[in-house]
């Protein structure tokens, strides 16, 4: 019974860790990432179409994205939409490929992003603690309803706490890795 409770807790906690990792992917770390263009829509034959559906987007260098439209007639439209998106990137068009050079992050911007990363980590820790509280309450109800003994309750509570500590440490490691990535020049 207690193994199932721990398994359920770990399943819920894994969702929190996955959500944290996904949130951290949105924090730009000076490297060019094609996913930054996911929300850009271009007018193509009278229809608003996602950029990735009308062009090949690649990252040939750490701080450069290239966009190669399949139909060269929409190059101006792509440029216009990138400039309108307020990404802080100026596209350069050579007639066949649009290049997006990503500027180096300033020290102040890096520190700002580090604070954002810490906030994401703290939110995840709060979620983990909330999950722990729910499972501790469930365990106490089980003991009150005589489903488990008092000794089993104490063992289960210790296991829940050690799992919580492990998950908190994992969140700290994820946040530290992202901070390190942000601060490297």
UniProtKB/Swiss-Prot annotation:
GO terms for molecular function: ribosomal large subunit binding. It is found in: Cytoplasm. Keywords: Cytoplasm, Protein biosynthesis. Its main location: cytoplasm. It holds the Pfam family RRF. Disulfide bonds: none annotated. One of its GO terms (cellular component) is cytoplasm. One of its GO terms (biological process) is translational termination. InterPro entries: Ribosome_recyc_fac, Ribosome_recyc_fac_dom, RRF_sf. Belongs to the RRF family. PANTHER family: MITOCHONDRIAL RIBOSOME RECYCLING FACTOR PSEUDO 1 (PTHR20982:SF3), RIBOSOME RECYCLING FACTOR (PTHR20982). Responsible for the release of ribosomes from messenger RNA at the termination of protein biosynthesis. May increase the efficiency of translation by recycling ribosomes from one round of translation to another. This is Ribosome-recycling factor. It comes from Finegoldia magna (strain ATCC 29328 / DSM 20472 / WAL 2508) (Peptostreptococcus magnus). The gene is frr.
